[in-house]
Amino acid sequence: RDFCLSRGLGDVYKRQPQGIMAVVKMKNNSLSDMLAGNPLLILVENLQDPGNLGTILRMGEGAGVTGVIMSPNTVDIYNPKTIRSTMGSIFRVPFVYVQDFSEAVTQCQKAGVKVYAAHLDGKNTYLGEDYSTPTAFLIGNEGNGLTDGITKQADTLIRIPMQGEVESLNAAIACTILTYEAVRQRTI
């Protein structure tokens, strides 16, 4: 078979390409598959930094998340920087882009998943919640956070306590803290 490759494809490896290339089939996951059992989900709304999305997928594999659900305006998961930052997790973590993010949140809730929004206005700290049951964490845009509509859909707004003058954490870091607290609770 002959393949025509884009010039930008080489940007995946900046300096020392290994001369290896692979052709893989794009995943076709469904939200309903991710809702089975006792799901631990990450719901990503309008994230724009490919490194953040890749880090979330990589962390998700390490934490054993059931899936990553993304809004249509989230950065392309097949962006070379995203792929590179997943360190291969893109091939092992279920993910799906949904056309109607609000409806996806509703579907999660109807399936018995409690949806938590990482939010600066959260009254509760993340440590005071029970994540041993079906759980999803909403993670918003790096600069703007979650949209008002999605924030209102959340079952509970939670926050990570901050010291000093820091207002918030990087989206991938915040997601990691929340997800690993859920993992800790599920393994006690």
List each model region and its residues.
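RNA substrate-binding interface of SAM-dependent RNA methyltransferases
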Residues: 29-122
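Single conserved hydrophobic/aromatic residue that forms the stacking wall/gate
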Residues: 1-13
